[in-house]
Structure formats: C-alpha cells, structure tokens
Amino acid sequence: MAENAPLLLSVIELLGYPNLRPLYERLGYRVATEFAVRKAISLMRKEKPAVIVADFYFQPDFRDRVSNLESLLATAQANKAVKVLVLFESSHEHALERLRSRFRIDAALTLPVRENELEAVLTDWR
C-alpha cells in the first residue's frame, strides 16, 4: 500500500467479526489495527487517520461512561476531517444513541457486518 494512502485505524476489542483488512486495503486505505482503545489513542496522537472503524460494546456496570469508546471519540473530535464508523450489536442501539448525543459518529453498522454495506460507506468517504 502506498505510504501516501489515507490511514484507516481499525480498533478491534471484541473480535466478533471477520478480518476486514483485505476490504480496507482493496479500497485504497493504509491500515493500522489496534486491539485496545488506549493504544489507538496513542497512535492517533502520532498519525492522523482519515477513517476510524471501531467496535462498540455497552456494559451496564460502567459507572462513569456508556461504553468502551468515549476516550477514543473524545480524541477523534479534535480532528474534524476524520470519519468515524462504529460497529455495534443491535441490542445495544439504545446505548449507542446515548453516545451519539455526546460525540460525532459519522456512520454505524450492526454486527454481523455486511461487507457490501461497509464498502458502500467507505467508498462514499473516499
């Protein structure tokens, strides 16, 4: 992949879907994958991704937040050009809506991911 290709940051904490890297690369993205939000934030401070694709999980026992993504989304807000795509379980849509009321999320797709839907979103953003 060309070094000047736009960076897509894939944040995978749940591993609940197939490897999407080949799709991202076919669409012309340079891909960085992190398996922890804190490592993704560290990478975002070094490089500015064009797109962030992150999985969302809701845990009712979180006292001070809705999900795993608050810190990541707060960091992403500083880069107005970055597009944020969240992958989520349909049963957690209510929690995702709470998160959307506080942070910009450009698109959200339910799991299991349908590659044609993901491809359509990412193609539109290129």
Regions found by a protein language model. Name each.
Residues 40, 66, 98-100:
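Residue preferences within the helical output face of two-component receiver
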Residues 35-51, 57-61:
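Acidic, metal-coordinating helix/loop segments flanking the phosphotransfer/catalytic sites
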